[in-house]
Structures are given as C-alpha cells and as structure tokens.
Curated annotation (Swiss-Prot):
InterPro entries: HD (IPR001356), HD_metazoa (IPR020479), Homeobox_CS (IPR017970), Homeodomain-like_sf (IPR009057), TLX1/2/3 (IPR042247)
SUPFAM superfamilies: Formin homology 2 domain (FH2 domain), Homeodomain-like
Gene (name only): TLX3
Protein name, entry field: T-cell leukemia homeobox protein 3
Compartmental location: Nucleus
Any Pfam family matching the protein: Homeodomain
DNA-binding region (UniProt annotation): 172-231
Residue stretches of biased makeup (Pro residues): 32-52
Principal subcellular localization: nucleus
Region annotation (Disordered) ranges: 1-68
Function noted in UniProt: Seems to be involved in the development of cranial sensory innervation from peripheral ganglia.
Tissue expression remark: Expression is restricted to neurons in the peripheral and central nervous system.
Any one of the GO CC terms: nucleoplasm
C-alpha cells in the first residue's frame, strides 16, 4: 500500500493547464488572440472659413465660431435648387469644397429677396441617401424659390393715401333720365287730377308721351313722395302759425284785462293817499313812477 501512495504523490503535484495562473497569463500562451489596438486620437480643429478676393464669405463655413464645419463631399440632393438663377440674375452654385458662395453686391431695389436656406453639411459616403425630412426640406426650398421668382416681375406699387382708398371702387350709378318740358307739364297735369294710375292708364299715358311704362311709374312714385313731404311740411307750418296766433290772442286779452280803467271811488278823489293807492298796479311790467304824495295837514 505504501508504494501506491508514493506513486500517487508526485501525480498530484503535476501542474494543471487550466489553473488560475494559466488563465491570468493567457496572452502569453501560444495561439491566444492579440489584444485590440488603442483608439485613434481625435482630429484637429477645422481651420477658419476662407474668404474670396472680393470679400465674399463662404456660407458653408462656421458662423461665429460655432462648431459646424463644412465637410467636403457631393451635394446631389440639394445642389439642384441652388443652380437655378434667382430673381437677382445670379447663379448660386456649389463650390468644390461643398460651400455656397454669394457675391458681395446689393440686391436690386424693389425686388423681393428670396429666403436663403441653411446649408446642410454633407456626410462622406451618404451623398446618395435620401431621408423623408430631406425630401420635405428640398420641396419647401424649391416652392419658395419658384414663388419668389413668379411674384417679382409683377410687383404692384401701393397707393399712398387713406386705407379705404385701396378698396374696389363702387359701381357707377346709372345716369339720371331727363324729360322734356312738354312731358313734365303733361305729367304734372295728370298728377294733380289723379295721384294713382292703373296699369292701363299708365300704359296709355306712356304711349302718348313717348315714354316707357317704367319711366312713368317711377316718375309718379317720386312725385307722390315729394307731394307727401310737401303736404307734411305745409301742415306743420300751419300748426305752428295757429299756435303762435293763439298765444298772441291770449296775451292781448290778458293785457286788455289788466289795462282796463278802474272806476275811481268818490272817497279816494278827495284823499290823495287813497287815490295813489288805488292807482298803484305792481303787476304791470312797466310801472310808471308814482308822484310824491303830499299829506294834508
């Protein structure tokens, strides 16, 4: 039994290929995969936007130092709207660097400047892709350019004046029909005899005066309106005149009753004080001065 135990002793101390040391030192073994490479360093910051000899800046560069560099690449999706000539007669084309160059000049006075869409940075390798939001933006830009180009030649100058003067003028009224003196005289005679005409009478009168039925009807309507107004004015004038006459008669009667002479009392004739009191009328408007009374001593 001892030799068997001695034979197993060295077998237990034999190194194991999958132990902790072998697992921790796995890369050192043959056939193990190499470690992944370290990540590349970040790219350097982009240079400032270049300027042309005429002082025109490139729109594709960053504005105000904002981190929006214009990446070089094709613009097949948004290059078509800018190649068309705008209302100023300038072709907006993309530069090889992927930016839009605008010449430094002032717009034509009176023209409507079209809105300049914001430049969309292109991603290398994705120039042929199309997204829904890109389609809507492209369609919106094209519609705006088309509308601006269509409205520019037909610019209407606004009138200076009151706002209501810009409205559509009212419809011109029909000129007033004029009749001859003979026609007016015959119409007046017939109106004084008869204020209202039947259809047959109106037709006969129109035929005799060489007028239309509508003209005779309109004339009689206007004449009746004038007659009613004149009659009302005459009645009002008569009523006012009658009122003034009644007031005048009442005033005269009242004054006559006040101015009637009073029969003097025989007793007052011998007494000057009583005579003065009898002749005193304080209700008169124009009272005469009372002479001084001398008392009899």
């Amino acid at each position: 039994m001892e030799p068997a135990a001695g034979a197993q002793g060295p077998h237990q101390h034999e190194p194991i290929s999958f132990g902790i040391d072998q697992i921790l030192s796995g890369p050192e073994q043959d056939g193990a995969p190499p470690p992944p490479p370290p990540p590349p360093p970040p790219p350097p910051p982009p240079p400032p936007p270049p300027r042309g000899p005429d002082g025109a800046a490139f729109l594709g560069g960053p504005r105000g130092g904002a981190p929006y560099p214009a990446l070089p690449g094709p613009f097949p999706a948004i290059a078509a709207p800018f190649e068309e000539s705008g209302p100023y007669g300038v072709n907006l084309s993309l530069a090889p660097g992927g930016v839009i160059r605008v010449p430094a000049h002032r717009p034509i006075p009176g023209a409507v400047p079209p809105p300049v869409p914001s430049a969309i940075p292109a991603v290398p390798g994705l120039g042929g892709l199309s997204f829904p939001w890109m389609e809507s933006s492209r369609r919106f830009v094209k519609e705006r350019f088309t509308a601006a180009a269509a409205l520019t030649p037909f610019t209407v100058t606004r009138r200076i004046g009151h706002p209501y003067q810009n409205r559509t003028p009212p419809k011109r009224k029909k000129p007033r029909t004029s009749f001859s003196r003979v026609q007016i005289c015959e119409l007046e005679k017939r109106f004084h005899r008869q204020k209202y005409l039947a259809s047959a009478e109106r037709a006969a009168l129109a035929k005799s005066l060489k007028m239309t039925d509508a003209q005779v009807k309109t004339w009689f309507q206007n004449r009746r309106t004038k007659w009613r107004r004149q009659t009302a004015e005459e009645r009002e004038a008569e009523r006012q005149q009658a009122s003034r006459l009644m007031l005048q008669l009442q005033h005269d009667a009242f004054q006559k009753s006040l101015n009637e002479s009073i029969q003097p009392d025989p007793l007052c004739l011998h007494n000057s004080s009583l005579f003065a009191l009898q002749n005193l009328q304080p209700w008169e408007e124009e009272s005469a001065k009372i002479p001084p009374v001398t008392s009899l001593v």
